[in-house]
From Swiss-Prot:
Membrane topology value: Single-pass membrane protein
Keyword Iron in record: yes
InterPro entries: 2Fe-2S_ferredoxin-like_sf, 2Fe-2S_ferredoxin-type, Beta-grasp_dom_sf, Cbr1-like_FAD-bd_dom, FAD-bd_FR_type, Flavoprot_Pyr_Nucl_cyt_Rdtase, FNR_nucleotide-bd, NqrF
Protein source organism: Methylococcus capsulatus (strain ATCC 33009 / NCIMB 11132 / Bath)
Cofactor note: Binds 1 [2Fe-2S] cluster.
SUPFAM superfamilies found in the cross-reference section: 2Fe-2S ferredoxin-like (SSF54292), Ferredoxin reductase-like, C-terminal NADP-linked domain (SSF52343), Riboflavin synthase domain-like (SSF63380)
Gene this chain is encoded by: nqrF
Keywords: 2Fe-2S, Cell inner membrane, Cell membrane, FAD, Flavoprotein, Ion transport, Iron, Iron-sulfur, Membrane, Metal-binding, NAD, Sodium, Sodium transport, Translocase, Transmembrane, Transmembrane helix, Transport, Ubiquinone
EC number: 7.2.1.1
Record's protein name: Na(+)-translocating NADH-quinone reductase subunit F
Boundaries of every FAD-binding FR-type domain copy: 128-269
Principal location class: membrane
Cofactor(s) of this protein: [2Fe-2S] cluster; FAD
Record GO biological process: sodium ion transport
Catalysed reaction equations from the record: a ubiquinone + n Na(+)(in) + NADH + H(+) = a ubiquinol + n Na(+)(out) + NAD(+)
């Protein structure tokens, strides 16, 4: 019995000693406490060692754009690290060239704060704010697209430029597609593909970016066009649906939603050149924002055309609004193209893919398509097809502006 007691005693003593050794080593090898991060040579923040730079900035109300929520894939959270950032990581090299890296460009979501740092961020970051908004409405405008309207707190406004975007946050959640409020006229395909059985289970907070559909004079609100991201056909049990789009589709009037912004690069140039807008799907959002801003706020007299592609009339939205703008503004024309019109549509307008319609019905006989400015947002295949068509007819790449968010 004595031997057993002694054995237990010595074993416990050894374990306790090892714990103290490990804790002592940790105190020597692992830095703790806070360090200073100097931003733009003006503002200093105190940051816990081990934080990601993106998170540290957000904790100090400096919201750097990050459409992927810090996953290192969107490359929007770029900052310049002038001192203290360590070596650039392999995860950053696919987004940052050697020349840019030599200038200190880094992805803030990939930079771990280990020592005092000096960084430079875009001035617009200092104007980015965060709000808790209230859902005013969340209606379908197409089979798989919602128009989400958020009300800002009383007296608040997002000071944005047309073509800008916000980031929306979602907490961990569980939802069933069967709980979505889908209007009766849009349920046919949901029934056909039995989408009601899909569920979304999200265990960690997420952030995504969405272009705004409202324009700056529509104050006090944020309007988004959001397409639901469903799993590939036959993969419903193994591939999850879109994290943020499922969350948004499940929102009801009165729900609270946290957003931050404004951000943006997809802005109209201040020239007299003709503007050609091309959109499809949820890419309608920045198109609406730009066109409304040009015609209603700026009273622009620039020549403008808008080419929007949809499958059928059911998938086309804001038709009455654009019809009214066209009637009231002689410098603006808009054209709808349907790729798969339904018999009940009685469609006599343009049919086919929008890049072909744009070329055959307009640019083919345009006296100088290379002198126009092109603004586009839509599904990836549409974007690629339009860009290639424009390059083929001699348009410089610098005159092709693309918003990758809205599709």
């Amino acid at each position: 019995m004595l031997e057993i007691i002694l054995g237990v005693f010595f074993f416990t003593a050894i374990v306790v000693a090892l714990v103290f050794v490990i804790l002592g080593a940790k105190s020597k090898l692992v830095a703790e406490g806070n360090v200073e991060v100097l931003i733009n040579g003006e503002r200093t923040i105190h940051v816990p060692i081990g934080s990601k730079l993106l998170t540290a900035l957000a904790d100090n109300n400096l919201f750097v754009s990050s459409a992927c929520g810090g996953g290192g894939t969107c490359a929007q959270c770029r900052v310049q690290v002038l001192e203290g950032g360590g070596e650039i990581l392999p995860t950053e090299l696919s987004h940052i060239t050697k020349r840019e890296a030599a200038q200190g460009d880094r992805l803030s979501c990939q930079v771990t704060v280990k020592q005092n740092m000096k960084i430079h961020v875009h001035e617009e970051v200092f104007g980015v704010k965060k709000w808790e908004c209230t859902v005013r409405s969340n209606r379908n405008v197409a089979t798989f697209i919602k128009e989400l309207v958020l009300e800002l707190p009383a007296g608040e406004n997002v000071d944005f430029r047309a073509g800008g975007y916000i980031q929306i946050e979602c907490p961990p959640y569980d939802c069933k597609f069967s709980d979505f409020a889908i209007e009766p006229e849009y349920r046919e395909d949901w029934d056909k593909y039995d989408l009601w059985k899909i569920e979304s289970h999200v265990k960690a907070p997420a952030i995504r970016a969405y272009s705004m559909a409202n324009y700056p004079e529509e104050k006090g609100i944020i309007m988004l066009n959001v397409r639901i991201a469903t799993p590939p056909w036959g993969k419903e049990g193994t591939v999850p649906p879109g994290v943020m789009s499922s969350y948004i589709f499940n929102l009801k009037p009165g729900d609270k939603v946290t957003i931050s912004g404004p951000f943006g690069e997809f802005f109209a140039r201040d020239t007299d050149k003709e503007m050609v807008f091309i959109g499809g799907g949820a890419g309608m959002a920045p198109m609406r924002s730009h066109i409304f801003d040009q015609l209603l706020r700026l009273k622009s007299k620039r020549k403008m055309t808008f080419w929007y592609g949809a499958r059928s009339l059911r998938e086309a939205f804001y038709v009455e609004e654009f019809d009214r703008l066209q009637a009231e503004n002689p410098n603006f024309k808009w054209f709808l193209g349907l790729s798969d019109p339904k018999p009940e549509d009685g469609w006599t307008g343009y049919t086919g893919f929008i890049h072909n319609i744009l070329y055959e019905q307009y640019l083919k006989n345009h006296p100088a398509p290379e002198d126009c400015e092109y603004y586009m947002c839509g599904p990836p295949m549409m974007n690629s097809a339009v860009i290639q068509m424009l390059l083929d007819i001699g348009v410089d790449r610098e005159n092709i502006m693309l918003d990758d968010f809205g599709g």
